[in-house]
Design a protein with these regions (language model features):
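Glycine-rich phosphate-binding active-site loops on the catalytic face of alpha/beta enzymes
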Residues: 83-95, 193-195, 257-265, 315-316, ...
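Short beta-strand/loop segments at the ligand-binding rim of alpha/beta enzyme cores
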Residues: 54-63, 153-158, 223-238, 300-312
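Arg/Gly-rich low-complexity intrinsically disordered repeat tracts
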Residues: 132-152
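C-terminal helical cap(s) of enzyme catalytic domains, especially alpha/beta-barrels
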Residues: 94-110, 268-282, 337-355
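Active-site glycine- and acidic-residue-rich loops that bind
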Residues: 163-175, 202-203, 209, 231-252
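A gly/proline- and charged-residue-enriched helix-loop-helix capping module
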Residues: 88-134
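Catalytic cores of alpha/beta
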Residues: 70-79, 238-252, 302, 306, ...
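Glycine/Thr-rich beta-alpha phosphate-binding loop at enzyme active sites
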Residues: 26-29, 33-43, 195-206, 249-306, ...
Length: 355
């Protein structure tokens, strides 16, 4: 059924379809009986639960950052069965992102190219939206995990970045602003220094730049009544030496986890849509990233001896794909491009196939 729907949706621009589909789902889920019907059809079985960072997840399948940038569709995504959703990337100030078109499908390769450019409503508006979500879903400020009390059990991650106009030497200030504003409303943080769509951002993956940003956030975190896990999202295009530097730093400062990986600027994995892939700049995601992502997950796990939890992201479409990541050492997995190609039942199908 979804293949038929997808063939129609793919006739229209990718970004337009994204918002159209989610807004239709939001309208449907505004009716409680329809939301419950959707949840009963798409949520995986209760025996998929998993605990990590003192958080209890309904399952190990999450939605990666960039899908719900502005925390507008949390109820709808929970109804589709996601165990956790990573909002953002959130920046201190609102920004429009790069010029459209900026999202491209490569259907023969089951891939996407995006050069969105951290388009988001800004941290103030998003924090207020999360506050309203918390109030409406029975979450309380004294909770260790404010998003898992009473009505909702959805775990929310906050993916944070810097504004395009902020020079790299001041980037730590942008991460601090976002961290403080969102701290009360998210369950964990992901520091994003690996997007290829903000000029110069990946330079912040260098060891000393990273140390400055993350250690500063850890100091703020330690002063809070309840500390939140801080993770780092890394690029798949790092050299072995760069990756070793990141891992060594993560071990040294006791980072709570790594997200492996972001999108790639490499186009070698394309087999069919090479013309589109080379014409359009931006980050490539989906099946072409699958092998490299798994290699990095395995390398991190072996080098850290499993001491640092890993969220795997890249080319996950099926239960077999997820199992490959778990076997490589991942604790959790995130889908994004797979969600577009496989449809709303992806979480339930993956969880079922993992049994």
């Amino acid at each position: 059924m979804y293949k038929i729907v997808r063939s129609v949706l793919f006739l229209f621009p990718a970004e337009w379809v994204h918002y159209f589909s989610m807004n239709v789902l939001r309208i449907l889920c505004s009716l409680d009986f329809i939301r419950k019907f959707i949840a009963s059809g798409f949520s995986p079985r209760s025996d998929s639960e998993f605990g990590i960072w003192r958080l209890e997840l309904t399952n190990r399948i999450g939605l990666g950052a960039g899908f719900d940038k502005n925390a507008k569709y949390l109820r709808e995504l929970e109804a589709l069965g996601f165990g956790f959703v990573e909002i953002g990337t959130v920046t201190p100030l609102p920004q429009a992102g790069n010029d459209k078109p900026r999202l491209f499908r490569l259907p023969k390769d089951k891939a996407l190219i995006n050069r969105m450019g951290f388009n988001n409503d800004g941290v103030k508006i998003i924090a207020e939206r999360l506050r309203q979500w918390a109030m409406g879903n029975g979450q309380y400020p004294t909770s260790n995990s404010p998003v898992t009390i009473h009505h909702s059990r959805l775990i929310i991650g906050g993916n944070i970045g810097k504004n395009k106009v902020t020079p790299n030497e001041d980037a730590w200030k942008d991460y601090e602003i976002c961290f403080k504003e969102l701290h009360h409303y998210v369950d964990y943080f992901v520091v994003n220094v690996s997007s290829p769509n903000t000029p110069g951002l990946r330079e912040l993956q260098e060891k000393e730049s990273l140390r400055k940003i993350v250690r500063h956030l850890q100091m703020i975190n330690n002063g809070k009544a309840v500390a939140k896990p801080i993770l780092l999202k890394i690029a798949p295009d790092l050299t072995k030496e760069q990756l070793d530097d990141v891992i060594d730093l993560a071990m040294e400062i006791k980072l709570d986890g790594l997200v492996a990986t972001n999108t790639t600027i490499d186009r070698d994995g394309l087999n069919h849509d090479f013309k589109i892939g080379t014409r359009e700049t931006g980050g490539l995601s989906g099946k072409p990233l699958q092998k490299r992502s798994t290699e990095i997950v395995k390398y991190i796990f072996e080098k850290t001896k499993g001491e640092i939890p890993i969220i795997a992201s890249g080319g996950i479409f099926t239960g077999a794909d997820a199992k490959e990541k778990f076997d490589a050492g991942a604790s959790l997995v995130q889908v994004w491009t797979g969600f577009i190609y496989e449809g709303p039942a992806i979480v339930k199908k993956i969880c079922k196939n993992l049994k």
